[in-house]
């Protein structure tokens, strides 16, 4: 009995059989780039861009420091303003209490005077 060997299909089919070819070409480009010893225009451009990125990072660091210092000053100003408002509020309430007590004292004095006047009027009748 001769058994024909059928080409076995893989259980999982690849959607695109050119995946290996794409991987090989990517590897070839990578190896070619590694083997290049000379500086090309592209690598020079990459170095320039890298330098620009370094300058940008330095600038951003300085800006962050300035913003932090500005934020600290703003927070200190807000704290001082809050303390001043609290002092004014306390002072206002103290004056209100003092005015109320003075008003009460005045009312008592007026009441006392009125009582004396009324008592004098009664005695005169």
Swiss-Prot record:
Disulfide bonds: none
Location(s) in or outside the cell: Cell junction; Cytoplasm, Cytoskeleton
Tissue expression from the record: Expressed in many epithelial tissues, including the pharynx, intestine, excretory canal and hypodermis.
Disruption of the gene: reported phenotype: Mutants are viable but developmentally delayed. They have bubble-shaped invaginations of the apical membrane into the cytoplasm of intestinal cells and abnormal aggregations of the subapical intermediate filament (IF) network.
Coiled coil feature spans: 46-95
Keyword terms, alphabetized: Cell junction, Coiled coil, Cytoplasm, Cytoskeleton
GO MF assignments: molecular adaptor activity
Single Gene Ontology BP annotation: intermediate filament bundle assembly
Main location: other
An example Gene Ontology CC term for this record: cytoskeleton
Protein's UniProt keywords contain Cytoplasm: yes
Superkingdom in the source lineage: Eukaryota
Region (Disordered): 79-125
Role of this protein: Dynamic component of the endotube in intestinal cells, interacts with intermediate filament and regulates intestinal lumen morphology.
Name by which UniProt lists this protein: Bublin coiled-coil protein
Organism: Caenorhabditis elegans
């Amino acid at each position: 009995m001769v058994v024909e060997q059928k080409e076995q299909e893989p259980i999982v089919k690849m959607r695109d059989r050119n995946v290996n070819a794409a991987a090989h070409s990517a590897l070839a480009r990578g190896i070619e780039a590694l083997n290049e010893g000379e500086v090309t225009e592209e690598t020079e451009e990459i170095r320039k861009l890298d330098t620009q990125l370094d300058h940008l990072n330095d600038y951003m660091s300085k800006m962050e420091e300035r913003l932090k210092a500005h934020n600290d000053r703003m927070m200190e100003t807000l704290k001082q303003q809050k303390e001043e408002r609290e002092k004014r509020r306390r002072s206002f309430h103290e004056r209100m209490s003092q005015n109320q007590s003075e008003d009460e004292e005045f009312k008592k004095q007026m009441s006392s005077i009125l009582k004396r006047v009324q008592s004098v009027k009664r005695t005169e009748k």
